[in-house]
Amino acid sequence: MWAIIGIPVTVLLILYRCKPSIFSTMSEHTLDWVRDKAIGWSHTPPRNKIDTHHHCVPSFYAKAVEEQGGDPSGWPTPHWSPLASKLLMKRVGVETAVLSVTAPGACIMPSRSERAQLARKLNEYSAELRDKDPESFAFFVSLPSILDTEDALAEIAYGLDTLHADGVTLFTRYGSTNTYLGHADVEPIWAELDRRGCVVFIHPTHPVDTNPVNSKLPQPSIDYPHETTRTAMDMITNKTRLKYPRCKVILSHAGGALPYIISRVTTPMSKAPDFAVSHRMGITHDQAMESFRSFHFDLALSSSPQVLDMLLRMVPHDHILYGSDFPYAPITAYPAFLEALESYEMDPELREMINFGNAMKLFPRLSTPRGGSL
């Protein structure tokens, strides 16, 4: 309808981001349409992908975050609806999106009971979406703070046994200090997830220090990848991956800086006796590399040629997954990273593995025929 009155949709999108009050009377469907039309899509690829990094932002969750002062990272909570997800999925060629709630999640709430209540509400909402359209949506369980151990274990059981979720989301860090995922306090959570052979999606959250480098660099753009690196190295050096090998662990954003950093830690280890390295680092060189290669890596905001070059050299090809990071990325990121992935030279079999084949192995429910040959 806006094209009729001659207003370019790109101008409307800028107005929406800068002056959202202008659109206060506009329906969600129209907002989603404006955003979709404003993106510079070059083409529509086949719909065969499984998007393992795709967020839902129900209105009650967005309200809860804003009532607590907003996302501590400083990143604005985006407009989202199921329709917005489906429009994006069509554009990037996604058949099924595995929904998750990103940080801060239920941890935004100040009290233990409120965290548990919000996590339960998020999970029941996600399950309802999945039940209405199981071909389009799957979901990861949202948890209260995993430092509220009993509450987190109860929600794992409810989410997996009652709601039949496809996995569980963990954030990179919990509490007011650096309790990363290799910490002893997290062991009961890992033990239960390992007992179940669970798929675990690790998403970064803000570091303790929320001050950005400068006003031009939103914290998630550079600090989130480093938080993923910190928690992964914490898990490696504390042998979390070796102790709980039945968990299939997905690292967001191609593992952050981990593929680049791992050799900085492990190369010196390769020249020292195992007993000396183990005494100093808690793990040998071979154990560290085994742990590193055990992770799965999604390509959300990470399909540029330089990242793909490194990832394909360093990790098993059947551990690389497609991801979009919708709706939290800048609006131009989706066509840009899609084009980068599609223009990267690889054989058709590998492309199908990344787009959907590897995810089908993690999520048996999604193992249905798709637009490729796998």
Annotate each language-model stretch with its function.
Residues 225, 246, 277-331:
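Active-site-adjacent C-terminal substructures of enzyme catalytic domains
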Residues 217-229, 242-243, 249-253, 259, ...:
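Active-site core of metal-dependent hydrolases
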